[in-house]
Amino acid sequence: MRKQGPANALTGKGRRGFVLMVITIILVLLAAATIAYMGQMQTEYKASSMFGRDIEARMAAESGIEFAAAQIANKESDPSIDVFHNPTLFYKRPLGEVDNPAGQVRFSILVPNRTSDQGGIPRSGMTTENSKFNINRLIEFENDTDEDTDPFMAISYVPGMTQEITNAILDWLDTDDSTDRTGGAESAVYEALAVPYSARNGPMESIDELLKVQGVTPLLFYGEDANRNGILDPNEDDGEDRPPGDNADGILDFGFRDFLTISSRERNRLPGGEEKININNGIVAEMHDFLEDDADLGTEVAKFITGYRLTGDQNADSQAQGKLTIEQQQLVDWIAKNISNGELGQVTRNGMDLSQPPTASFRSIYDLIDAQVQVDIGGVPTTLTSPWSSSDGAALMEQMIALERKLTVLNDEFIDGRININTASREVLMAMPDMTEAIADKIIELRPPIMAGGASEQMMATRLSPIWLLTEGVVDLPTFKRLGPWLTTGGDVYSLQVLGHFDVGGPTTRLEAMIDATQTPPRVTFQRDLTGLGRGFDPAILDPAN
């Protein structure tokens, strides 16, 4: 038997060392794999958590839109609800309560506050589309018989607007294919483009259609406010260094979309949906009976309004006195023809002969103020004085608010395109016929400031009707009556932005929406995700400590 030599013994020790080294390497690799796996799992956990938080923020923002619609619906039964600027109601509303600030999700309903050249802090609330000029009404300016009414002058205060663009808009809206307007464009121009399309030749169905109109560029349409927050941000005031292209003049140039709309609309019905009393009703006897039967109006009101329709206001100037519309005149002619044929007997109310056709109509219910009519009552010439006098401003405010709820001058279910004098910008105010720069500046000057705690409720309580322009001395009565058909302090189509956000960290979702309250219940008609444009508002504004 041979003895194992030293070399063999050394080889055995080497093998044991080699195994130990292999085991060590394996353990190191396993540890590295474990660490890598744990890191990957941690990354996956963070990604999953962030994804979940992103969903929470989005759900919060969408909840904010539904909450806004609910508050608009509540406003119908409780007009005291302030949806213009109400931080208590719309600012940092929690979705549930949690102890961990990083897990507390909220929504804030905001509207960019375009109160200066640099913008301002956002309002906590909504704005009505009646704060803008309804571009579909532009064609009315051209068809108006008043020589002082000019389409370009109406929108010339909108930044970037030109005569050529105005003419192109008119060509887009009118029903013909005539190209006699300087700088205008009809379907033939658009159909020759690389991607052809035709002019609408009718009312626009979306304000975005302006981008199809010749001469309207994205910069003109959107302006320099790239992230749509209403604030002049550094990248919006640095020339061509960063998008958007701007002129670096220290002024935030807003776009057409901030001044123009196609959605401004108001309900022309009572809160329950019943029809208002139309004081331009072609059948005057029917109008009289509706007025007389109303418990809040009665015989004297019915007599005066009927007398006005028969003979007109003796105190009115030529521009403020309403004439019969074509439809009204046709109805009057039909009634007169049948009376002369003996098919309709004599019709009288309160001693007034309603067999004679009416000669006047109302441009707005404000024509009633300080009016005076001369009418035969029982065959005796009689002077009737308006029950609504401008001598007592406080009383007139209450009376006009009541009349606005009950009376109308139109049969239509909706009223389109009036301008909210409490919220419209100077550029939009100047679109109204008979508006002057001095009047527009005074309206802006008298608005309460937007503060963190809300607008001045006491001041706004006296401005529930456009009549405040008269009672606070902004305009005289003849001017107010001429402006009357354009004036409102309401609007039933609302626009807003909603942020879904956390108290600490986390993603933010920003949505833009439009809510149509001319329908019951109010309906969300438009929603757009603005998250890709960034948070938009300084995080300090949303800090729960503020």
Please name every model-derived segment.
Residues 2-3, 16-546:
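Compositionally biased linear targeting/interaction segments
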Residues 1-13:
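N-terminal secretory signal peptides that target proteins for export/translocation
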